[in-house]
Regions:
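AlphaC helix of the eukaryotic protein kinase fold
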Residues: 43-67
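Protein kinase glycine-rich loop
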Residues: 15-22, 27
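Conserved catalytic-loop aspartate of Hanks-type protein kinases
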Residues: 194
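Protein kinase catalytic-loop region centered on the HRD/HxD motif
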Residues: 120-132
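Activation-segment/catalytic-loop signature of the eukaryotic protein kinase fold
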Residues: 79
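Conserved short submotifs of the Hanks-type protein kinase catalytic core
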Residues: 83-97, 101
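Activation segment signature within eukaryotic-like protein kinase domains
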Residues: 116-117
């Protein structure tokens, strides 16, 4: 199923503009025509790989994100499936990723970076208190608005202590430059793994490169 601008999803969400595309799927800026508000729509790609495995992962992302109500976590509004394609309807965050900010500016003064890190840590604390481990904390998944508000995004490889294991034992999950030593060894991630990754993010922002 090819997604195009103007297409209506679930008779409610209009696709306005593709924001990103990867191996797992596409992310669109959309519009909720019932509530008249912008939304972000993450759609599974059905033309590559094991579609059922991807759907299983997307369902897990929806499950893990559903109850994480916090100002520093991008909210999930709805999950919908049609013709073997899954759609995550999420809060639209008009902002730049911390990765974009690092790329444009190199380093940030501690007085500017610290509030970003604090907000990210608060969001992670809420996720951890619900038994959810992000497992892919990195600048690209930390959105920062023009007012300095932070939203953690993309729980696509997250793990919940209340769900069945999706990844195989020994499988490395996350982005290599930011994952904790235990993740790099294929061991189970813990809340401390996310904090380690946030430490790498902090180091990069202060020094201009990763440790």
């Amino acid at each position: 199923m090819k997604l195009v601008e103007g297409q209506l999803i679930h008779r409610r969400y209009r696709l306005d503009r593709r924001l990103a595309q990867g191996g797992m799927g596409e992310v669109w800026k959309g519009h909720d025509i019932q509530l008249n508000r912008p939304v972000a729509i993450k759609a599974l790609r059905d033309d590559q790989g094991n579609v059922e495995a991807k759907l299983h992962r997307l369902r897990a992302e929806a499950h893990n994100s559903a109850n994480l109500a916090h100002p520093n976590i991008a909210a999930l509004f709805e999950y919908y499936e049609h013709d073997s394609i899954g759609f995550l309807i999420m809060e639209y965050v008009p902002s730049d990723s911390l990765a974009d900010i690092y790329r444009d500016r190199g380093t940030l003064p501690a007085t500017e970076l610290l509030p970003i890190l604090i907000q990210t840590a608060r969001g992670l604390f809420v996720a951890h208190s619900h038994g959810v481990i992000h497992r892919d904390v990195k600048p690209a998944n930390i959105m920062v608005s023009t007012t300095g508000e932070v939203k953690i995004t993309d729980f696509g490889v997250s793990y919940s202590t209340n769900q069945e294991q999706i990844t195989q034992d020994g499988m490395v999950v996350g982005t290599a430059q930011y994952i904790s030593p235990e993740q790099a060894q294929g061991k189970q991630a813990t809340p401390q793994s996310d904090i380690y990754s946030l430490g790498v993010v902090a180091y990069e922002g202060l020094c201009g490169h990763r440790p």
